[in-house]
Amino acid sequence: MTQETKPRALNRLKSMYELRAEVDRMYEGGVEASEEGKPVAWVMLEGWSNAILNAMGVKTVFPENYSSLCAAQGMAEPFMERSEAEGWPSHLCGYARASVGYSARMVDLDGKIPPEAPGGGMPKPTLLVASGETCDARFKWFQSLGRFFDAPVWTLESPSPGIRERLSSETYERNVQFLIKELKAFVAFLENLLGKKMDWDMLEFTGGGTNEINRLRWEINELRKSRPGPMHTRDFWSVMTAALFRGAADPEVIIEGHQKMYDEVAERVEKGIAGINRPEKYRMAFEGLPPWHTLGFLDQLAERGWNFVIESAYRPMRPRTIDLSMYDDPMERYVRRRYRSLEESLQEEYEPDEVEIIRNEIIRDGISSRLGLKHISDYQVDGVVLHVLLTCRATSAGLNLLQRRILDVLKVPSLVIEGDIIDASAFNAAEALRKAEAFEETMDHYRKVRKELGMPW
């Protein structure tokens, strides 16, 4: 008599594997380009440069993503140790530390890829493209990497006005003009470095592909509002790399892969199939960056019926519909197609009466308690996991405030788990699981509270 094998807790999407394979091809393409003497850029994720670099014939790889790949395969620790030996502190961003250690190893090998590097490794860069937004390490991280290779570093700046200022249409227009000027300067730098002119038609192709990929990602996420949640956060994290860190991959290939994923998720919605192979007991949201080194922790939570149906990091924006026919400048079209005002976002995301409340709160207080919460209510989650990172102040500093706002406004509790994106030693999975078990009583309690208040879930 044969014994039935219990299916694994996560019900992975078949279409995920095809998109995930594109990430491997990205790194393979970088190595091949380097071997052929073609330019390769190491890029910090900032949303603008990849399409421009690809239009200029530059292959792109991302140290941020490569560090997470190393962590997921259990190969980050040697690079982290090397960065500490080079004098870098242990509280620095894990992405930065791993890439610094990797770069130091390359110097040991006269610029060759370390033989222990997973995924084929990153080749020696022709240039590095940094960003001045969000990350604490910012451009200093990439300036430091440039010293290992004597490679030029370009820092792309992006305007970051306060919330109150962003309500102004004048601020929005100034931001647009700032970005146009900044990106044109970047193009001029590339033309001088590479000795060739920008192919503006190619930028229309690569930039347009980025927009179509974002549209499909957004539509897939809309399907994830269904009960039971048809797509788990692990699948989202696995495929977001192919969209955001796609390097010089053909946009049409990535679009086709996301269309297949949309179709598969839509079929699951129609048939009531969940992203976990257990009854969906709790619908969960994940706030913060992932613990790339211990993603199996989410499998353990899935065994308990925790279905992570939405996440904050790397979430796509609502697609933008805009008439660009009045703009002759291809760079202006590139910017305006993607950069939206706060007022526009509010009008798209909220009901008119709520827009007025949010606008008044921002004018009065400089912030609104309702901002950043909509996905919690839209996906009707029972609890939120807050991943607090010692090494990433940018994503962690506001989580305590977020925890309070989620509870006050939506009556949804949060579980704080301390860890790291790359450093596995900073994450205690057993302790986190014990806290999760106890947290279930809290989620059960607030379900009753929401019901008594007449809330939708």
Set out the residue ranges of the language-model regions.
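Cap/lid and interdomain-hinge subdomains that line or gate substrate/regulatory clefts
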Residues: 143-232, 441-457
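A short, acidic, amphipathic alpha-helical segment used as a generic capping/interface helix at domain edges
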Residues: 112-116, 353-379, 397-401
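Redox- and metal-dependent alpha/beta enzyme cores, enriched for Fe-S-associated oxidoreductases
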Residues: 35, 46, 54-84, 288-364, ...
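A charged, amphipathic alpha-helical module
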Residues: 2-39, 180-320, 361
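Extended, charge-rich low-complexity interaction segments
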Residues: 94-105, 182-204, 336-365, 442-457
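Proline-aspartate-enriched helix->loop->beta-strand connector
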Residues: 125, 376, 380-386
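Peripheral docking tails and interdomain loops at the edges
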Residues: 400-457
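An N-terminal, globular interaction/scaffold subdomain
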Residues: 40-121, 134, 141-142
